[in-house]
Curated annotation (Swiss-Prot):
Pathway: Carbohydrate metabolism; glyoxylate cycle; (S)-malate from isocitrate: step 1/2. Substrate binds at S91, G92, W93, G192, H193, R228, N313, W314, S315, P316, S317, T347. This is Isocitrate lyase. Pfam families: ICL. It comes from Rhodococcoides fascians. The lineage of its organism: Bacteria, Bacillati, Actinomycetota, Actinomycetes, Mycobacteriales.
């Protein structure tokens, strides 16, 4: 009888927690026995999530920093890895705007179906796996790791602790390496750069983080759990139940019954310290790019948790040139990395790249006709020659040659291979 999928024993789980450096500083509000009880007799192998989690953890611990771009589609992710990035970021904002399962365009307010982000994680992984297959049959070794780790946005969890557990589970099945969770009220969730944000009590967000960790442990995957706080800008909180939040109450109440709170860096620091035992990385959402604010946050958190890793959002919601000069922009990432901000990302890079790229082409095409597209094609040829761009050969890029290989493996005498005799073979050398 096969032993594949047999879960670890309670003793083996506990030994891993006690001896594996991966779990240094991690607090669990549950026992190894409770994890074992929840596993059943078979645990599905989550190869992509496990592999991605291990790679991501290695990167953020051993590189100066990892910079990432938000991908909106599978092909965008492929281009990012082809160009030299080592990790993919997937934002809920972009999924809301153009990639959710309801097929609608939404603002970043958790209006889309909760399984939409896992669906896009799976799509991106499928695209990366195909790129890896194509590269292998072509003998292309220029990319070290095609199936790069994906950090995905769980927003505010779409509900309570059980919703968070199920969403983390879905992220793992889809192959996410890391997942971030924000401390907003899910039913009133807003983009970090919109108004009207409502915080949940510190203890409630710890419950969310605990649910995510439990789901990962039950799946036997070392998922990278990221805690985000929106306390820098939020002006409301649902309850005064947690004494850690009370010093920031401003004495006001709203028509909905929410409590007014004083925002800023101090509540962010307080929350980050509370989340640190439960999170592998911590992200403070900010309204402007400011090295001094980042330094204060890092020094305050790491004075108590010296090994705590941090994350930073290079948000397109900032007008970068209005805040920083070119020299500061050029050194910003390196200096953040030295402060412990090991995962740095541009959340909406895919949205802006996709929309501006198409607008620019359409603007030229509307006025110049085919000249505009030929200009684009010539830039593609130049990028292929000088920088390793491959999508100029679009049939090859999506796997026509790979599926020809399948066809000729099945029947070496086939006369219906796709690339042979194609215009791409004839004109794109």
């Amino acid at each position: 009888m096969s032993t594949t999928g047999t879960p670890k024993t309670t003793a083996e789980i506990q030994q891993d927690w006690d001896t594996n450096p991966r779990w240094k500083g991690v607090t669990r509000n549950f026992t190894a026995q409770q994890v074992s009880d929840l596993q059943g007799t078979v645990v599905e192998e989550a190869t992509l999530a496990r592999r991605g989690s291990e790679i991501l953890w290695d990167l953020v611990n051993n590189e100066d920093y990892i910079n990432s771009l938000g991908a909106l589609t599978g092909n965008q992710a492929v281009q990012q890895i082809r160009a030299g990035l080592q990790a993919i970021y997937l934002s809920g904002w972009q999924v809301a705007g153009d990639a959710n399962l309801s097929g609608h365009t939404y603002p970043d307010q958790s209006l889309y179906p909760a399984n939409s982000v896992p669906s896009v994680v799976r799509r991106i992984n499928n695209a990366l796996l195909r790129a890896d297959e194509i590269a292998k049959i072509e003998g292309d070794t220029s990319v070290k790791n095609w199936v790069a780790p994906i950090v995905a946005d769980a927003e505010a969890g779409f509900g309570g602790a059980l919703n968070a557990y199920e969403l983390q589970k879905a992220m793992i099945v889809a192959g996410a390496a890391g997942v971030h969770w924000e401390d907003q009220l899910a039913s009133e969730k807003k983009c970090g750069h919109l108004g009207g944000k409502v915080l949940i009590p510190t203890q409630q967000h710890i419950r969310t983080l605990t649910s995510a960790r439990l789901a990962s442990d039950v799946a036997d995957v070392p998922s990278v759990i990221i805690a985000r706080t929106d306390a820098e800008a939020a002006t409301l909180i649902t309850s005064d139940v947690d004494e850690r939040d009370r010093e920031f109450l401003d004495g006001t109440r709203t028509a909905e019954g929410f409590f007014g709170v004083k925002n800023g860096i101090e509540p962010c620091i307080a929350r980050a310290k509370a989340y640190a035992p439960y999170a592998d990385l911590i992200w403070m959402e900010t309204g402007v790019p400011d090295l001094e604010v980042a330094k204060k946050f890092s020094e305050s958190v790491r004075s108590e948790f010296p090994d705590q890793l941090l994350a930073y959002n290079w948000s397109p919601s900032f007008n970068w040139k209005a805040h920083l000069d070119d020299a500061t922009i050029a050194k910003f990432q390196k200096e953040l990395g030295a402060m412990g901000f090991k995962f740095q990302f541009i959340t909406l890079a895919g949205f802006h790249s996709l929309n501006y790229g198409m607008f620019d082409l359409a603007h030229g095409y509307a006025r110049e006709g085919m000249t505009a597209f030929v200009d684009l094609q010539e830039r593609e040829f130049k990028a292929a020659e000088e920088r390793g761009f491959t999508a100029i050969k679009h049939q090859r890029e999506v796997g026509a040659g790979y599926f020809d290989r399948i066809a000729t493996t099945v029947d070496p005498n086939t006369s219906t291979a796709a690339l042979k005799g194609s215009t791409e073979e004839g004109q794109f050398h």
